[in-house]
């Protein structure tokens, strides 16, 4: 069962504590919002800092909550973000990838977007699995036109990578699990 828990760690702690004590947590992964930390948006940092001196701390707290839950559960864990100020907060990422490296799982992910992963708890980084015969990866993330859906489009987790991570980290005693 996949359970998404929204809110701060303080809001979620009663349910998280129950899950960690009574259920088998098999994987924890976080997707901190990149709007305030990705270097692609650095030109707006000063303006944001004037409005809220702690704007990047708030984003880092999401990542830290993921790390804390992962460590408490004992399960493999990670969080992702594009190239960002997180390297200065959490250190060098454990891994990086581009979506096109996993087109063997989803050919629609044939694009570039360097994404960093900070991981622990025995997380296994999947080996690249590229679909043969595809054209060179495109630059759709950087070329996305302005609009209401631009941020959602740019921040969507590549399906091929998600499937690869699932297969690399799924519980070994139940090999019949399938990706949703």
Describe the residue ranges of each PLM region:
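General small-molecule cofactor/ligand-binding pocket signal
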Residues: 5
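Conserved acidic residues
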Residues: 2, 26
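Class I S-adenosyl-L-methionine
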Residues: 8, 12-24, 34-178
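A conserved beta-strand element that flanks and buttresses the S-adenosyl-L-methionine
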Residues: 29
């Amino acid at each position: 069962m996949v359970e998404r828990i929204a809110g701060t760690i303080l809001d979620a702690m009663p349910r998280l504590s129950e899950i960690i004590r009574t259920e088998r947590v098999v994987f924890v992964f976080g997707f901190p919002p990149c709007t305030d930390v990705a270097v692609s948006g650095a030109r707006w940092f000063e303006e944001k800092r004037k409005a809220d001196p702690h704007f990047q701390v708030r984003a880092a707290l999401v990542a830290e909550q993921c790390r804390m839950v992962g460590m408490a559960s004992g399960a493999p864990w990670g969080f992702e973000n594009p190239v960002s100020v997180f390297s200065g907060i959490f250190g060098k990422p454990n891994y990086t990838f581009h979506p096109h490296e996993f087109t063997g799982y989803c050919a629609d992910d044939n694009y570039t977007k360097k994404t960093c992963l900070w991981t622990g708890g025995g997380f296994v980084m999947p080996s690249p699995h590229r679909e043969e015969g595809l054209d060179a990866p495109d630059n759709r993330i950087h070329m996305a036109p302005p609009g209401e859906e631009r941020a959602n489009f740019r921040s969507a987790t590549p399906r091929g990578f998600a499937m690869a991570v699932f297969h690399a980290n799924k519980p070994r005693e139940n090999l019949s699990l399938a990706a949703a």
